[in-house]
From Swiss-Prot:
Top-level taxonomic group: Eukaryota
Keyword Hydrolase: yes
Name of this protein: Probable trehalose-phosphate phosphatase 7
Family, per entry: Belongs to the trehalose phosphatase family.
Top enzyme category: hydrolase
Organism: Oryza sativa subsp. japonica (Rice)
UniProt pathway annotation: Glycan biosynthesis; trehalose biosynthesis
Transmembrane segments: none
Keyword Hydrolase among UniProt keywords: yes
Amino acid sequence: MAKASVVVPEQVGAAAAAQVGCPCPGTTLFPYPPPRAGIAVRRKCLQAAQQLELGAGLRGGWVESMRASSPTHAKAAAALAAGVDEEHAAWMARHPSALGEFEKVVAASKGKQIVMFLDYDGTLSPIVDDPDAAFMSETMRMAVRSVAKHFPTAIVSGRCRDKVFEFVKLAELYYAGSHGMDIKGPASRHAAAKSPPHNKGVLFQPASEFLPMIEQVHQRLEQATSSIPGAKVENNKFCVSVHFRCVDEKSWGALAETVRRVVREFPRLRLSQGRMVFEVRPTIKWDKGKALEFLLDSLGFADCSDVLPVYIGDDRTDEDAFKVLRRRGQGVGILVSKHPKETSASFSLQEPAEVMEFLLRLVEWNRLSRTRLRL
């Protein structure tokens, strides 16, 4: 059966909009036009980052990629003064606000089960200098709890699953930590009662064999970066993060070279970069997109046309999930960002406060819809 639960912003144009009614299976109906030239600098940095993930590139390439991951960098301010307002308007036309297009988003869910996927840092909580202090507000927790009462809800984070649970403190959710390499289902009886029998307490760890190696690289990175002020190494169980948000920019090159040197000692691990952070992960083909598909399958929605996955995230690692939605030709990808950047998401929200507003509106819309059905 065709998957037609797709939302296309009107601004994308008639060519994309004309595809909405196409019943052909496998057709991509999302608005994914080619990126405009206005994002050329950021695209160049992202391409450099992709090469660096493969071990290529010089120290300078790493530093440029690190700057690209810092939207508040002085270069961003200079670019804004140079006329980024026009670029931002063009980007918003391609990735309009999920709040402004809310009715279009929920219209796509008619006759379908919404399943929510939420990143944590930068999505449910603000980005802070100390990753151990990235607490979500109580109002955000209430919003997520309300969403979970109406829709199956998962937190998909690069953090250690246990750490994310400490922050969120909601037992009725699914948690996918370490970029989806550590997945566990709801613990509460109420949540389990609403889940398929084969899904209760699901636990999936595709990278278990890497645990000793991750511990080794964590120790090596802590030792190697101890002389660089501000560098923080975090063990996320199945991956290791090296945060450089508090590192002086003059030391970025030295930090990048240090991290690369350590990771080269572990050929079965790969190095990538996120938002002001280096990520060291196993080389297995598993990411947030794979986690999204695994969770949909666990919920009984594999290859179903009566489901609408909604994924909200702010980081490069969330792009894997956005690309899965694009490939499936169904669902809603929402990027959280105040700055234009290349993305496979359909819509955007600027900050966690807007994410909370979107979640609360979704809950209220669902309540009103149920009330109308009873009348």
